[in-house]
């Protein structure tokens, strides 16, 4: 029989036992392509000459960076640590020097709003125990070839602190991970 839950009871049990859940093909290829293309457009529209904030999870130098700290309600761009931020790269190679875009894409960009604020995602959040799920933060994280920074082992709750713990991250792989595109 069909369950009223948006996920099966087996999936819910797996979530409860392991703290994560993999849902294959939750989003269509077209929906994923929309975000990939939109991220490229956002980068092309951005003038990076007056902004050079670097994001890396090892030294976490961004923790003292107001551009980063004040990004919760904005769309902001953060560079790879190994990116050469010269005039040529800031104009010609813009697509390959950005580490991530964050943190309010889900509130400020139509394509990301459509992807993030939908019934299915809300229902999954409710199925895993959230009574009134809210979107707090969104990021588009790049895996840049040859210069992509290391992401050290971490839990998102380290960065998004609530008491009691009440946050969960939804992570979407927009492309298949391969050796050619910087697999995880």
PLM-predicted stretches and their roles:
Residues 1-17, 24-153:
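Non-heme Fe(II)-dependent double-stranded beta-helix
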Residues 20-22, 171:
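Short aromatic/hydrophobic contact patches that present stacked aromatics
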